[in-house]
From Swiss-Prot:
This is Probable chaperonin-like protein PrmG. Disulfide bonds: none annotated. It comes from the Bacteria. The lineage of its organism: Bacteria, Bacillati, Actinomycetota, Actinomycetes, Mycobacteriales. GO terms for molecular function: ATP binding; ATP-dependent protein folding chaperone. Gene3D superfamilies: GroEL, GroEL-like equatorial domain, TCP-1-like chaperonin intermediate domain. The keyword Chaperone applies. The keyword Chaperone applies. The gene is prmG.
Length: 391
């Protein structure tokens, strides 16, 4: 395919047009007086939103050079959303200002590389200042102020989230769920999170959010690498007899075993998700044991004397709901015995008191947080699909 080339001032001008086109559409949503945008959909009703990254995703320009500029700013918004989860409009406005002033300096004869180095030094200074000004959240009132943003959020819906008992504000979370009613309801459940996601995108159940959600699954816990059909088949048969989906937490799943599980998802014969077990090295078996206590199952390992071919229902853990993204797994409503969970937490706290190495202390604190974490599940409803998405 032949390429169209543009140089110097003309190229910079067309790139800047794309940057401004996207940024001007996004920045109207900035701040407490930010306005909404209406986005046309090829199918279904239009979307009303004041979320910067949602608006940015929809923008494609006819001019290929201007579109390159728009895509550069879109990448800024999407990266900010992925790392922070908010602040996309602010990032877009800052990117527009940096492009505008940088191009102005170049037009006046400044060396582009010196301009870039100056921007990088300024970024370092700004980050240092922001870190000094940062305020740690201190309790439920701080959480309410954060949750009430944007201003369209109602005080009623914010207060519908129950306070997570015996849990610090930093370890609690409130994931929204779609409801069949028009109001908002909530309940509190135990939750555990770790930073491993699904190993195959074919296991996704919600392509729009790129996440896999399993309701009331059984959970296979093992520190082994599963490759053959014979190794995974007993767990599949147990799950199918119980008519429940299967979550596999293992060192790895590959080969025919993975193909069998992926095929079951694609043909809707057996819903399953495979996640690499949390932890690394000698810590992996310890973290799997934490999960086995929380979920009420057993770890399939050489040390426990249980083989994959011997798996039965009593060896599998159970949970209310599992949400798996590309990089994170959230387990809500584990069904383990509370007495055993409390005993495990006391055991970990005793280890924490004896630990002297910072890395060991950090790992133990994380394991305790997973065992004691709670989540408030908010079910959000609306009269129309547009109202539901806005809430």
């Amino acid at each position: 395919m032949a390429k169209e080339l543009r140089y110097n001032a003309e190229a910079r001008l067309r790139l800047e047009r794309g940057v401004n086109a996207l940024a001007d559409a996004v920045k109207v949503t900035l701040g407490p007086k930010g306005r909404n945008a209406v986005l046309e959909k090829l199918t279904g009703p239009p979307t009303i939103t004041n979320d910067g990254v949602t608006i940015a995703r929809e923008i494609q320009l006819r001019d290929p050079f201007a579109n390159m500029g728009a895509q550069l700013v879109k990448e800024v918004a999407m990266k900010t959303n992925g790392v922070v989860g908010d602040g996309t409009t602010t990032a877009t406005v800052l990117a527009q200002a940096m492009v505008r002033e940088g191009l102005r300096a170049v037009e006046q004869g400044a060396n582009p590389m010196r301009v870039r180095r100056g921007i990088e030094r300024a970024v370092t200074a700004v980050l240092g200042s922001l870190t000094e000004q940062a305020v740690q959240i201190g309790g439920r009132s701080d959480l309410e102020r954060i949750a009430r943003w944007p201003p369209a959020t109602t005080r009623w819906s914010v207060r519908s989230s129950p306070p997570p008992s015996n849990t610090s504000a930093r370890t609690a979370s409130s994931p929204p769920r779609r409801a069949t009613h028009s109001g908002c309801r909530s309940r509190s459940s135990t939750a555990s999170e770790f930073d491993h996601g699904y190993i195959s995108g074919y296991m996704v159940t919600n392509p729009e959010r790129m996440e896999a959600v399993l309701d009331n699954p059984v959970v296979l816990l093992t520190n082994k690498k599963i490759t053959s059909v014979q190794e995974i088949m007993p767990a599949i048969e147990v799950a199918k007899r119980a008519d429940r989906p299967l979550l596999v937490l293992a060192e790895d799943v590959d080969g025919p075993a993975l193909q069998l599980l992926v095929g079951g998802n694609m043909h809707n014969t057996m819903r399953s998700v495979v996640v690499r077990a949390p932890g690394f090295g000698h810590r992996r078996i310890a973290e799997l044991e934490d999960l086995s206590v929380a979920l009420g199952g057993h770890v399939i390992a050489k040390d426990t004397g249980i083989e994959l071919s011997e798996v039965s229902m009593e060896h599998l853990g159970t949970v209310m709901r599992v949400t798996v993204t590309e990089n994170e797994t959230t387990i809500v409503g584990a069904h383990g015995e509370q007495e055993l969970v409390d005993a495990r937490v006391r055991h970990l706290e005793a280890q924490l008191e004896r630990a002297r190495i910072d890395a060991d202390r950090d790992a133990l604190e994380l394991r305790i947080a997973r065992m004691t974490g709670r989540v408030a599940v908010i079910r959000v409803g609306g009269v129309t699909s547009v109202e539901l998405k806005e809430r």
